[in-house]
Regions:
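Short Lys/Arg-enriched alpha/beta "domain-start" segment
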Residues: 1-72
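Intrinsic-disorder-associated interaction segments
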Residues: 14-18, 22, 48, 107, ...
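Hydrophobic beta-strand residues in large extracellular and virion-surface proteins
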Residues: 40, 72-74, 89, 101, ...
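Residues that cap or initiate secondary-structure elements
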Residues: 46-48, 56, 80-82, 107-109
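Short, hydrophobic/proline-enriched secondary-structure or compact coil segments at domain edges
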Residues: 67-80, 97-105
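Broad, structure-driven detector of short, well-ordered beta-strand segments within folded domains
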Residues: 80-94
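Membrane-proximal, non-transmembrane alpha-helical segments
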Residues: 91-139, 153-167, 182-202
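Hydrophobic, helix-forming membrane-interacting segments
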Residues: 140-150, 169-187, 206-239
Length: 239
């Protein structure tokens, strides 16, 4: 009798991919088998893919190249035979973001051992803003601004002419619809709130800049606007 395990696991949360994660995964693979053969395949925004045999080679390449990483596949074979135990871990920050773990094993106990180790490792690299990565953040921001305008005008007893009211409502509806439909807005959102954050080579510098923009949007625009209205509302009772 021969046991065969074919399993695919998909994860909805976002992850940070950096050298520490890749070295941790490599260590897990080598602990299981010294015969492990690693391959890292990276897809970039120049429509090209690059294949590396080790972690250091991958980082050295992207230290010199400005290509934006879109997806990465980490494959490992535990042997040289075609039917050797295999694992493929995929991270995709494209139009259809994905984190996927595939197993082909001939032993159920070994499969569960590796699966648990990899998942424990990934848990340490979850993105702090991963919920925002999945939410339609741009329409939500427009909605928050729209609600803030409504609340503020109500507090101050400001009555806009009918034309202005229709214009504000129209901007909100058209803006929310456009952001959802047009790909350019999806790409902007995917850059500011990525489901997968690749901190590899020059991509780490890009992620640092995006983090500053993300903090400005969440901290200054949203929280600042809400706090401003709350403070204004409270001041009406005090003064």
């Amino acid at each position: 009798m021969k046991e065969e395990i074919f399993q695919i696991h998909r994860y909805s949360v976002g992850y940070k991919i950096d050298k520490q994660l890749l070295l941790s995964l490599k260590d897990i693979f080598e602990q299981y088998s010294e015969k492990s053969v690693l391959e890292i395949r990276v897809g970039c925004n120049n429509n090209a893919s690059y294949v590396f045999d080790n972690v250091d080679e991958c980082f050295e390449f992207f230290d010199k190249k400005p290509y934006r990483i879109i997806k990465m596949e980490i494959s490992v074979m535990f042997g040289t035979e075609y039917n050797s135990n295999q694992i493929k871990l995929s991270f995709d920050n494209g139009d259809k973001p994905l984190t996927e773990l595939r197993f082909r094993f001939d032993n159920g106990d070994d499969y569960l051992l590796l699966k648990n180790k990899i998942e424990l490792c990934l848990n340490n690299f979850k993105l702090s803003y991963r919920i925002l990565s999945r939410l339609p953040i741009m329409p939500m921001l427009l909605t928050i601004v729209f609600i803030c305008i409504c609340v503020y005008t109500d507090i101050k007893n400001i009555i806009f002419p009918g034309t202005i009211q229709w214009m504000i409502t129209g901007i909100w509806i058209v803006g929310s619809f456009s952001i959802v439909v047009f790909p350019v807005f999806t790409r902007i959102k995917r850059n500011l709130f990525p489901c997968i954050e690749f901190k590899i080579g020059q991509n780490a510098l890009i992620e640092k800049k995006n983090a500053s923009k993300r903090n400005f949007i969440v901290g200054t625009v949203v929280i600042g606007t809400v706090l401003g209205i709350v403070v204004n509302y409270i001041s009406n009772f005090i003064f």
